[in-house]
Amino acid sequence: ESARLASSSDTGEGHPGGAFQFAALLEALAGMMPAAKPLEMHLVGHSAGAIFHSHFVPELVHRGLSAASLSVLAPAVRNDVFKANVAKFVGKAPGIGALTMCTMTEDAERDDDLVEFLGATVYGKSLLYLVSRAFEPKRKTPILGLEETLRADPVLWPLFNGGGARLELSPARGETPNPHTRALRHGCFDNDAATMRTVATIVTS
């Protein structure tokens, strides 16, 4: 519910939502920047942050604004929402200059015990599996950060598999680590040193 209210253009109570208000603020800021030094934006979202950006990006584009990059970390956004609201703007102006996703491999997602109680595993997969299986109206809803549903998507997989977007997968324990992202739990991407170096390199390049 919090993600929905933050992401929506309208809260449903007659008030503009967070995506609308933030985009309007950036539009005003961009208008104050000198022509020789335009506003440069880099967007980063972890988990539900990708849901926010999937509603924020269209608000930017509607105002003629672009983001130099969008980095999504273990994104919890549905595939259909991301396709409709973000994928079509990658490489476009206005739109998204560079798209990067860091997430876990399918094996690593299955190794991520989300819920443990008194030493016993209560839910033996990652949060993204729980979102896909229990938090969406339809069971097994395709979620962007799940490798298996990404590979099965006829639009998104070509985009991330040589189509202009960058995909960095963190493998399961015991496999060769990826130097660009090493998080082994869903909640660790935003404090994983390798992932943060990757994001910092994108922002400063």
Q: Which role fits each region the language model picked out?
A:
Residues 54-58:
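Short, hydrophobic alpha-helix immediately C-terminal to the catalytic nucleophile
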Residues 43-49, 53:
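Gly/Ala-rich beta-loop-alpha elbow adjacent to hydrolase catalytic centers
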Residues 1-40, 59-205:
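Lipolytic serine-hydrolase domain surface
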